[in-house]
Amino acid sequence: MHIGTRLGAAGLAAALLLPTGALAAGPDQAQARQEDLDTLYAALQEHHPDLYANTPQEAFEAKKAEIEGRLAEESDVDFALDLQSLVALIGDSHTTTNIGSVLNSTGLYPFGAEWYDGSWVLTGAEEEDAALLGQTVTALNGVPMDEICTRFGTLVSADNPVKLRRQTEQLLYSEACLDYLGIAESGEPLEVTTSGGSFTVEALPMEDFGDAALSSLSQQRESTPATAYRKGTYYFAQSLDDTTYYIQFNQCMEDPKQPMDGFAAQVEAELEAGDYRQVLLDLRNNGGGSDGVLVPILMLVPGLVEEGVKVYGLVGEATYSSAIINAVELVDAGGVLAGSPTSGSVNHFGSTGSFTLPNSGIRVSCSSKYIDLGTLLEAGLGAQVEPLVPTVRVEQTLDDYLAGRDTLVDWLLANGADYTAPEQPDAPLTRGRLAWMLWQAAGAPEAEPAPFSDLMPFAYYAPGVGWCDQTGVANGVPGGAFRASCAVTLEEAAQMLVRFVRQQGLTPAEVRSCLLYTSDA
């Protein structure tokens, strides 16, 4: 097998993005670098919504002074990594320097490791070391893997541990990064220690790396599951069996060959023609884009749930950015999340813009706002900058990977249709849920869509909010919003209940019955 799909330029580009120009050289090199450093810090101060949210200003200025002390002597590559290490202090996965092409000019070690069963597993090696594939990687040059992740935390842009681990995985074979972090020395071999023995590798120039022969663990797979990631495919749907319908959504982008409206119509027709008990929406390999693309599919979810169909959103460590928003939206629509914690954080900085440093040509992506999903979606209420953790926790195992099985999908095929999500008795009562409960108590009459700017039309509580608005049971707030995801105050709850009683013309006995109904709903 030739390196080039999992490793090489693609991995580095994914970790630190792309492209840059040539760095300045000559007697004015230090001055040019100083200008770039000053420009970077000033632009971050001006454009980032909360630069010092995770690291105090003093630490930024100390790091900047440290970098200034070596501007005249360090290499172009180390200067680029210095810039990224300054950006890493923000603790924002979306704000990063795009130095992938700088790293692509450096050496790459011909091996690979990925995360399975709670440890690092050797997934790529030169042919003479292929017998160690599948073994646990414990150290590089004697540095334990946990310590290596910690060191990468000073270099990469990551706002949660899952994102840090993925960034580490994508840069683990970069000679320049390992040298910068004191794990390896450029020009010297790297010792890889596994549970089955150790071996050494020499870094290869990028131009030779793509042609190097590498044995891969993927070559040992017995088969590939029907739900395997289809790289390059925006979305597709298929029946897995008579009871399970599967949708793979890989990019939050419209497929030019099949716009989402048409795809959603196809899905709806196929669901109506079948007798499915569960629908799986797979977001495990979706790295983001525009969260609005999925709305036509999300609009189908409340009706399915009402008919007794279980709807699962499948998430994993590659679920990121707008795909996180879609996953939380799915829960608000009545779905359940299954899989493993995500690299994308529920609340996060995002909506990026960019600027370019004047001398190096390095482009910097910078967040422009903080996205707090709890202000829009009930399922995001109380969340922090943290991975999205699914209700159903099922991790892909190495044994299943090698056997060609999808651990999560197999579990859902066996258990999903009959699974009942645990109750959340401590969850706060939101304005949206109370509106839904009162609408249900009224018999769930037909209601026009509510006009509120912050109300998602696919949310399970949307009809209730619409009915409450039309009947005067509940009103919006200034600015045309309803704040459905916010916890209802005692005053708001009392007002809504009093208005509901009047609207329904209830007797005292009926009021008591209604209160018992809503408390049990």
Model-inferred region functions:
Residues 1-8:
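Bacterial N-terminal signal peptides that target proteins for export
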Residues 414, 418-464, 470-491, 497-519:
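Feature responds to low-complexity, polar/acidic, surface-exposed segments characteristic
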Residues 11-19:
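Bacterial N-terminal signal peptides
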Residues 16, 24-278:
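Flexible, low-complexity junctional segments that flank or bridge functional domains
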Residues 33-36, 56, 60-63, 79-86, ...:
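Stable alpha-helical elements in mature extracytoplasmic
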Residues 27-41, 196, 232-420:
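C-terminal "post-core" interaction segments
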Residues 41-55, 71-75, 87-90, 94, ...:
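Sec/Tat-exported extracytoplasmic proteins
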Residues 20-22, 517:
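Short, low-complexity export/processing leader segments characterized by acidic and small residues
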